[in-house]
């Protein structure tokens, strides 16, 4: 799911 990937990337940016 692309949403899954987006969530992962957003998490990385949050750091």
UniProtKB/Swiss-Prot annotation:
It comes from the Eukaryota. Induction: By ethylene. One of its GO terms (molecular function) is chitin binding. The keyword Ribosomal protein does not apply. The keyword Acetylation does not apply. One of its GO terms (biological process) is defense response to fungus. Keywords: Antimicrobial, Chitin-binding, Fungicide. Has antifungal activity against A.alternata, A.cucumerina, A.niger, C.gossypii, F.oxysporum, F.oxysporum subsp melonis, F.moniliforme, T.cucumeris, and V.dahliae. Has no chitinase or agglutination activities. Belongs to the parathyroid hormone family. This is Chitin-binding protein HM30. It comes from Hydrangea macrophylla.
């Amino acid at each position: 799911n692309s949403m899954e990937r987006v969530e992962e990337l957003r998490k990385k940016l949050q750091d």
